[in-house]
Amino acid sequence: MRYGIFSLLKNSLSGHQNWPAAWREPEPKLSYDVIIVGGGHGLATAYYLAKEHSITNVAVLEKGWLGSGNIGRNTTIIRSNYMLPENNPFYEWSMKLWENFEQDLNFNAMVSQRGVLNLCHSDAQYDAFARRGNAMRIDGGDAVLLDAQGVRKLYPFFDFDNARFPIRGGLLQPRGGTVRHDAVPWAYARAADARGVDIIQNCEVTGIKIDNGRVAGVYTTRGFIGCRKLGLAAAGNSSEVGAMAGLRLPIESHVMQAFVSEGLKPLIDGVVTFGAGHFYVSQSDKGGLVFGGDIDGYNSYARRGNLAMVEHVIEAGVAMIPGLARVRVLRSWGGIVDMSMDGSPIIDKTDIEGLYLNAGWCYGGFKATPASGWCFAHTIARNEAHALNAAFRLDRFRRGYTIDEKGVGATPNLH
């Protein structure tokens, strides 16, 4: 069924009791052409495999329910304000896919291009933002460099006067914004299912079978499932799943916390990031401030953080907006992020025939979902990288071709 005004009116006559299921709950087949592990980027990959490459004998294996992983545990921000030539075109393509997301998948994902503003607090940071903005514009993106007065016009309640970290200006990307994170896996699942993809929930991979250097299938909690090609898109569990195939990945897993405050009157129109500390905030449609900051800094697979980081993140928020000191936090949650050694992702085939890897997303996984799935589908279908992900090779760390957007070196917890 196509969602629209007519289907809404039709189902309103029955009190909305006769809506069909958005996707099927199939039993696993004995084998598939392609299996994708992970219900975040994996769903996007399956959709684009079916749509762009007509490969429909595909299964997506999710160990929990759809949306229970990082795809539903983020702060909903989308942006493409990168500078390096390896990153910028990729994220700009993702932004373009976001802009057509709802029309393409026939699903209301609440795509809101309300703008993303990065604050700067020194002359050097202002110059760096000017360079970044120029790089964005060269690659076809949008960027506006604001001085302190320009920022004050947008957000007069920020700490401008006698501030510990004076605001010198900011870099605004008007096309950035937010997307309802729960709606993204639902939209991809519905669209992929309509094209024949099997989405198998509560199916955890426990092993990978390799015969003579080639993938033969996966062992799961629902039995063995054979396949010709296997794509790993397991986010924070990438290292564990990769180890099942004998891969030792240049990735660390860390917990990252996110928070939402009590509901407030309209306050923050867009997305704002603090330049003197790691803090980013937007306001949801319910009025809650959705915010986050640094990862907890220690390796963990637990989806919960510690109070020291809660204090650290909120201190940064209050330094930017003193009025937040009186706002109560409603709840918090955690997700496991796969931190690569240079802060950039890996989308590549491996040395094992038929095995492909999508991992190392650090803080940037959600915003990259469409482009990640699109490029990963191309890599799996054609057994070669697309130009957009050609630089995201697994062997770049050995070859010395790292993509270090922040320039902090091989320290995963700093990216």
Residue locations for each model-derived region?
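Extreme N-terminal leader/targeting segments of oxidoreductases
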Residues: 1-33, 51-55
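Glycine-rich FAD pyrophosphate-binding loop
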Residues: 50-71
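Dinucleotide-binding Rossmann-like beta1-alpha1 core, especially the glycine-rich loop
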Residues: 75-157, 278, 308, 316-318
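Short beta-strand to alpha-helix junction loop
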Residues: 89-92, 119-128, 171-190, 200, ...
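Helical element adjacent to the flavin cofactor pocket in flavoenzyme catalytic cores
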Residues: 171-229
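Central helical "cap/lid" subdomain
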Residues: 220-269
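Active-site lid/adjacent beta-loop-alpha segment flanking the redox-cofactor pocket in flavoenzymes
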Residues: 248, 263-356
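C-terminal catalytic lobe of FAD-dependent flavoproteins
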Residues: 318-415
